[in-house]
Amino acid sequence: MSIRAEEISALIKQQIENYQSEIEVSDVGTVIQVGDGIARAHGLDNVMAGELVEFSNGVMGLAQNLEENNVGIIILGPYTEIREGDEVRRTGRIMQVPVGKELIGRVVNPLGQPVDGLGPINTTNTRPIESPAPGVMDRKSVHEPLQTGIKAIDALVPIGRGQRELIIGDRQTGKTAVALDTIINQKDEDMICIYVAIGQKESTVRNVVETLRKHGALDYTIVVTASASQPAPLLYLAPYAGVTMGEEFMYNGKHVLVVYDDLSKQAAAYRELSLLLRRPPGREAYPGDVFYLHSRLLERAAKLSDARGGGSLTALPFIETQAGDVSAYIPTNVISITDGQIFLQSDLFFSGVRPAIDAGTSVSRVGGSAQIKAMSKVSGTLRLDLASYRELEAFAQFGSDLDKATQAKLNRGARTVEVLKQGLHKPLRVEKQVIILYALTRGFLDDIPVVDITRFEEEFHAWLDSNATDLLSEIRTTKKLADDDKFAAAINGFKKVFVASE
């Protein structure tokens, strides 16, 4: 077979015409130091702050310090396989996490990867973990109540949808229990909940997940966990991953509750990273931008305007105090960022008052606008009455003679404390809260012995379910107080059948 010269020249011409002369340029650096979750790389001249970089073994990192001769990178995964001299390359992307309804009911790490052994999460939607908070004109005043199901909170320090309410207290004072009860109470409220566990023990997170599953709350909850065994970069990123997953729902007109348990551990992880990156330490060795760490996170909680869909994202950040010291650096920072705080006292907790909410120092800066009309009417003076009772109680311990008015205040105060006690994982519907608080504030409980108050309340709720369903549904639908006669008839009707202890 003869090959003609014309064919050969035509083929060569075609090859020349189709030749692609584009060169793929990728910015590559070299690892010069690695350890403790931090790497320093030389040669990434054009890398951006916060950009994702990829090491030669596939582990990702986040560029943080851009210095004259090197780049400080926090490593998002195991760093033991990374060696000095390894290649590290830019990706041109910032960090994103998967979002969407496919995550609901799952337990994921801060990178959005499932850790519950239930298989992959089939979602293609992602959002950047750092995004600007909604602007002033995109927001609306907080006006819808978020019912926690906890009498002491819904009556004394009400939380609204889109609010940021700090839960602060020493370790072992019931902070997590408050959050779990709130999540459990959202069952029929069309609310998506996100529980972010930062630096918790794996066993604790397991217990939380099982509690949520047992009460049917995992059907509308995402659990994001960065446990104590994880490297510091994941603890630092966990809250941002949680709020990003929540924002996807908020911008689609849904209502979201995000619990950060707890931000003290995130601040400690960020301090660790900052010191390893050789950033100058400030007060309590925290870096200078630790306020911005929390403010840019909590500002992303909002109640959106109707034009933006009317969705909301409510934040419940936790801060752990040392021996009740709320004047430390991180507690004062977060108190100044949030719209109020619920202060849990260890003294109250160990004396059997649970939830151990200190009415004197707890405050909600949204207040009555986050309560239904019925609740704001029955709980109007409750907080002041409770605070004055605490003062009188201390005074009465001296055993001096008390006048009738003071004695009456002490008696009412003792009953108030008993009514506000609540069992673990037993959230109460708002209409039942209204009726028992009405009975308390209008003096219907003054003749019930203090030791019987808790039993009276439990039996009263059961009696209401079978004998006063009309009253319950009226409060639920109108959100206003029914006629005094209806309340009196229901309360007196039950008092006739209630048997007080001797």
Curated annotation (Swiss-Prot):
Main subcellular localisation: membrane
NCBIfam families in UniProt: atpA, PRK13343.1
Region (Disordered): 115-135
HAMAP family on file: ATP_synth_alpha_bact (MF_01346)
Record SUPFAM superfamilies: C-terminal domain of alpha and beta subunits of F1 ATP synthase (SSF47917), N-terminal domain of alpha and beta subunits of F1 ATP synthase (SSF50615), P-loop containing nucleoside triphosphate hydrolases (SSF52540)
Region forming the signal peptide: none
Swiss-Prot/TrEMBL keywords: ATP synthesis, ATP-binding, Cell membrane, CF(1), Hydrogen ion transport, Ion transport, Membrane, Nucleotide-binding, Translocase, Transport
Protein's name according to its UniProt entry: ATP synthase subunit alpha
Membrane topology: Peripheral membrane protein
Protein's organism: Bacillus mycoides (strain KBAB4)
Annotated residues for binding of ATP: 169-176
Site keyed Required for activity: positions: 362
Catalytic activity field: ATP + H2O + 4 H(+)(in) = ADP + phosphate + 5 H(+)(out)
